[in-house]
């Protein structure tokens, strides 16, 4: 990259100063943020304000020496700085702005350090140095901030919500904890409890009660019940309208802690490759939700929300990564993964020789041919030289369709032979793959560029267990991500449980990173 000459001279001047031999050689014309009188240009004040407000994007102002820079600029506005002080301030502001812009755009840590294995997307390269050089020439930092800000879905809405929670940090409603619940652990309609006035204050501060609503009643009124019900809906709680232990624990979480949770989602939106194609599929593990997006006027618009089932938290968590979907298989065979075969299925086959027939399974040798059940076949299954697969049909574990995005972890999207499981609120119950509730809708979205696959043909292929494999004309990015705060279809903010403990990992990584 071609270096701007004034910036190069400023860097040289500061390096010499650091060696205590540049004071007499430093010239105001070499500095970027100060004028000829060694006082701040307006653009320097703009930069300091942005750094001080870094927490509004989920970043940390102390990381950028924001207060120190703001104070130094304020002092320089009153009295010109000595040359060596001016050089030091100029360099500090340059480095802080560059660090802020890069961390705003790319994030603060490498996601692979917390088991989130994303391949960078094909977005245009972000060159903070070049954009800063241009900004200093024009006196306008807005193009730099705009280019640095992620364009990911939900980012701006979550940023707005973050600022709302930051404003609530000092709210007196969280100045003291709620009193202990009675032994029954649930406050019921019109029951009295001394904590209800404080609860009403918190619900009003969060927007669940009108500011004009009475906040001094010690009874659980219908109005307060409705507010509790709405709060429960947006915080992954059973929506009963009663004030129970889970709701108490949730609303005792302070606005500062909630702001940190939103900030973690903003950090993840900087990593996740959500800006790379005309159409994409995003699976959000904590939400048990799949969203399909289509790009309109350079903005990703959600076109399809679908409930999903994901991997069990302790034993089979669904990995977090991205790959391109390349084909769809109707009426797929289910090739039983070796771990499931070894740990779960082989003991059943050994104890019940009819298990293979009843489940519509077959044993397959290394040559791909079917093998009858025998002691030799059991030995082959045990040593891995043979495998088991389930034939297509009504009881097939994959249902009527499988969506394939090749990866080395054998993860894919598929339907299921047990659709009733989608009615459960907590749906971390698979062996790692992602089960989708509405496979026909997803197939229609995926096969958009394959016009011969009409809605009727898709339905027939799934319902009649016919069809085979279809290669997509245009691969579709699939991103399996982990966002514990989201903006729902109703435009409200939802807080989700940290089902895999990834938020805790991210928080530790942020605390340990170099300052």
What is the meaning of each model-derived region?
Residues 2-13:
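Bacterial N-terminal signal peptides that target proteins for export
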Residues 30-32, 118, 136, 143-515:
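Well-ordered beta-sheet/strand-loop patches within structured domains
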Residues 11-22:
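Bacterial N-terminal signal peptides
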Residues 21-24, 208:
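Intrinsic disorder/low-complexity segments in short proteins, especially the signal peptide
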């Amino acid at each position: 990259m071609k270096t701007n000459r004034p910036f190069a001279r400023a860097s040289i001047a500061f390096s010499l100063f650091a060696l205590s031999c540049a004071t007499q050689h430093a010239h105001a014309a070499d500095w970027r943020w100060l004028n000829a009188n060694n006082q701040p240009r307006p653009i320097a004040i703009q930069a300091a304000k942005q750094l001080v407000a870094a927490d509004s994007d989920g970043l940390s102002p102390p990381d950028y020496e924001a207060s120190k820079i703001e104070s130094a600029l304020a002092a320089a506005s009153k009295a010109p700085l000595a040359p060596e002080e001016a050089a030091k301030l100029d360099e500090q502001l340059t480095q802080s702005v560059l660090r802020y812009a890069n961390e705003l755009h790319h994030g603060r840590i490498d996601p692979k350090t917390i088991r989130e294995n994303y391949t960078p997307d094909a977005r245009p390269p972000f060159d903070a140095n070049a954009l800063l050089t241009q900004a200093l020439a024009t006196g306008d930092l807005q193009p730099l901030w705009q280019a640095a800000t992620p364009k990911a879905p939900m980012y701006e809405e979550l940023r707005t919500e973050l600022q709302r929670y930051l404003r609530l940090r000092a709210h007196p409603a969280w100045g003291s904890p709620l009193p202990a619940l009675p032994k029954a652990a649930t406050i019921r309609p019109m029951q009295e409890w001394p904590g209800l006035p404080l609860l009403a204050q918190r619900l009003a501060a969060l927007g669940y009660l009108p500011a004009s609503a009475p906040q001094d009643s010690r009874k659980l009124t219908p109005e307060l019940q409705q507010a509790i019900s709405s709060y429960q809906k947006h915080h992954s709680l059973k929506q009963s309208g009663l004030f129970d232990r889970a709701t108490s624990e949730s609303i005792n979480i302070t606005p500062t802690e909630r702001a940190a949770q939103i900030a973690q989602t903003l950090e993840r939106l900087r990593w996740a490759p959500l800006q790379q194609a005309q159409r994409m599929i995003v699976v959000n593990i904590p939400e048990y939700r799949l969203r399909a997006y289509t790009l309109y006027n350079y903005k990703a618009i959600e076109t399809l929300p679908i409930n999903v089932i994901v991997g069990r938290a302790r034993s089979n968590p669904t990995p977090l990564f991205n790959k391109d979907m390349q084909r769809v298989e109707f009426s797929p065979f289910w090739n039983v993964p070796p771990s499931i075969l070894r740990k779960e299925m082989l003991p059943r086959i050994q104890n019940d020789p009819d298990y293979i027939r009843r489940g519509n399974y077959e044993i397959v040798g290394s040559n791909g041919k079917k093998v009858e059940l025998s002691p030799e076949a059991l030995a082959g299954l045990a040593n891995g030289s043979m495998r088991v697969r389930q034939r297509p049909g009504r009881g097939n574990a994959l249902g009527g369709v499988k969506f394939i995005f090749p990866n080395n972890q054998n993860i894919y999207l598929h339907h299921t032979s047990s659709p009733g499981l989608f009615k459960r609120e907590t749906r971390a119950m698979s062996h790692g793959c992602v089960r989708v509730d509405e496979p026909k809708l997803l197939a229609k979205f995926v096969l958009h560029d394959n016009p011969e696959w009409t809605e009727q043909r898709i339905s027939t292929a799934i319902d009649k267990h016919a069809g085979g494999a279809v290669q997509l004309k245009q691969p579709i990015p699939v991103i399996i991500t982990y966002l514990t705060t989201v903006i729902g279809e109703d435009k409200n903010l939802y807080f989700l449980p940290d089902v895999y403990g990834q938020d805790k990992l991210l928080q530790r990584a942020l605390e340990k990173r170099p300052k």
